[in-house]
Curated annotation (Swiss-Prot):
One Pfam family recorded for the sequence: Hydrolase_4
Protein's name according to its UniProt entry: Alpha/beta hydrolase domain-containing protein 17B
Species of origin: Mus musculus
Active site: residue positions: 170 (charge relay system), 235 (charge relay system), 264 (charge relay system)
Keywords per UniProt: Cell membrane, Cell projection, Endosome, Hydrolase, Lipoprotein, Membrane, Palmitate, Phosphoprotein, Postsynaptic cell membrane, Synapse
Posttranslational modification: Palmitoylated on cysteine residues located in a cysteine cluster at the N-terminus which promotes membrane localization. Palmitoylation is required for post-synaptic localization and for depalmitoylating activity towards DLG4/PSD95.
Protein encoded by which gene: Abhd17b
Tissues of expression: Expressed in brain.
Family statement drawn from the similarity comment of this UniProt entry: Belongs to the AB hydrolase superfamily. ABHD17 family.
Listed GO biological process terms: negative regulation of protein localization to microtubule; positive regulation of protein localization to endosome; protein depalmitoylation; regulation of dendritic spine maintenance; regulation of protein localization to synapse
Chain positions with Phosphoserine modification: 282
Length: 288
């Protein structure tokens, strides 16, 4: 006890020692769904309907490149999945775990734009309790959700692990790190990552307690794939120090991207974001 900081002591005695409680306080802000999925009579084909709040930025032709379906997780929830065919000759598919306050409808335009610019297809999914997915968002469900997405990507589309880039943004780095620590892939990209829930809420926390949530810091050293970390230096939600700490623990780090002046939600608006991704996907992965 003598080695604990004041903030750690406060957390220890004031917060219930339960990862789920910490997670619910910190992490999950599911929006009202911005899309619906309608199934045909055969039960095998799903149609995506976007609401105005999805802010779709492309034509119906681009929308035809999006395939959606539902799959079941090991926890019994049915989650919505989205496969975006951005490029006919794409070597890699990004398995994209999005942030905590959006759903697939809101992300669909971003996926089209990103994939077409870096020549990758994109596979994504909604966490339990988000969008059309059933259940509730919890830490355990996050891990089951990404596992189900990984299995669907591999079995439904026949995509091999060496052609999958695991990509996580913000809270999405939590399922991404967990998956990448258990399965090898072409690469891992962590965009505005966190070290753990306690370390976000209490920045002076120096170690992982049994009741901490989202312990990326303890899992990242188990990742054997190349890891690219991207973080804004002025991140007001997850401090830049989290990206640095994770980078230092990587087995196979590549040159990170520290975006000078960027916050938590605008990294992708800086030109060097796309430049770094293009370089990583089209040049560096070939030689790794």
């Amino acid at each position: 006890m003598n080695n604990l900081s004041f903030s750690e002591l406060c957390c220890l005695f004031c917060c219930p020692p339960c990862p789920g409680k910490i997670a619910s306080k910190l992490a999950f802000l599911p929006p009202d769904p911005t899309y619906t999925l309608m199934c045909d009579e055969s039960g095998s084909r799903w149609t995506l309907h976007l609401s105005e709040r999805a802010d779709w930025q492309y034509s119906s032709r681009e929308k035809d490149a999006i395939e959606c379906f539902m799959t079941r997780t090991s926890k019994g929830n049915r989650i919505a999945c989205m496969f975006v065919r951005c490029s006919p000759n794409a070597k890699y598919t990004l398995l994209f775990s999005h942030g905590n306050a959006v759903d697939l409808g809101q992300m669909s335009s971003f996926y089209i734009g990103l994939g077409s610019r870096i020549n990758c297809n994109i596979f994504s999914y909604d966490y339990s309790g988000y969008g059309a997915s059933s259940g509730k968002p919890t830490e355990k469900n996050l891990y089951a959700d990404v596992e189900a997405a990984w299995l669907a990507l591999r079995t439904r589309y026949g995509i091999r692990p060496e052609n999958v880039i695991i990509y996580g943004q913000s809270i999405g780095t939590v399922p991404s790190v967990d998956l990448a620590a258990r399965y090898e892939s072409a690469a891992v990209i962590l965009h505005s990552p966190l070290t753990s829930g306690m370390r976000v809420a209490f920045p002076d926390t120096k170690k992982t307690y049994c009741f901490d949530a989202f312990p990326n810091i303890d899992k990242i050293s188990k990742i054997t794939s190349p890891v690219l970390i991207i973080h804004g230096t002025e991140d007001e939600v997850i401090d830049f120090s989290h990206g640095l700490a994770l980078f230092e623990r990587c087995q196979r780090p590549v040159e990170p991207l520290w975006v000078e002046g960027a916050g938590h939600n605008d990294v992708e608006l800086y030109g060097q974001y796309l430049e770094r991704l293009k370089q990583f996907v089209s040049q560096e992965l070939v030689n790794l």
